Swiss-Prot record:
PANTHER family in the record: FMN-DEPENDENT NADH-AZOREDUCTASE 1, FMN-DEPENDENT NADH:QUINONE OXIDOREDUCTASE
Catalytic activity: 2 a quinone + NADH + H(+) = 2 a 1,4-benzosemiquinone + NAD(+); N,N-dimethyl-1,4-phenylenediamine + anthranilate + 2 NAD(+) = 2-(4-dimethylaminophenyl)diazenylbenzoate + 2 NADH + 2 H(+)
Primary role: Quinone reductase that provides resistance to thiol-specific stress caused by electrophilic quinones.
Subunit text: Homodimer.
Cofactors demanded by this protein: FMN
The organism of origin for this protein: Pectobacterium atrosepticum (strain SCRI 1043 / ATCC BAA-672)
Gene name for this UniProt entry: azoR
Protein name as catalogued: FMN-dependent NADH:quinone oxidoreductase
Amino acid sequence: MSKVLVLKSSILAGYSQSNQLADHFTTQWQSAHPDDSITVRDLAAQPIPVLDGELVGALRPSDATLTPRQQEALKLSDDLIAELQAHDVIVIAAPMYNFNIPTQLKNYFDLVARAGVTFRYTEQGPEGLVKGKRAIVLTSRGGIHKGTPTDLLEPYLRVFLGFLGLTDLEFVFAEGYGYGPDVAQKATEDAKTQLSQLVTA
């Protein structure tokens, strides 16, 4: 039995294309793997605090007394990392906002990227400590950017997730939603087809 973690990050709730694709994936996965468990974390509905000068002090080893706000941030970071490590399949719904990931997802990344916990530095270089997992990124865009210099999202996510140890990584692109209903419909259909294939892979 596998455990699946689905991370949503769109600010558009039910109107979000990436959220709808994530919901489709969840439904397909439950149908194909009825014994598996699925956890959905909506980073827009349950926002993660922005990492600032005070909070970053909570995430670094120190003997200093933590403020109540730092204590909350450290506990949240510990909980998020434990949740991440406890799952076998990580699904990230990451729409493109202004050529990058949503702030909500970046805030999550900032709390789960911790030296000595999710990665470490060795004589051979950095080593990710989030290992043995499969990761799937669902990314929706108004324009068409895949394979072009304007797609900053895919290379960033490959570097960041790989840095944590998530190297078994697949992308599903749903592009062109700003080009009209016909293009949008085909983008959704193609993405759903690919997702259905990944569910049974």
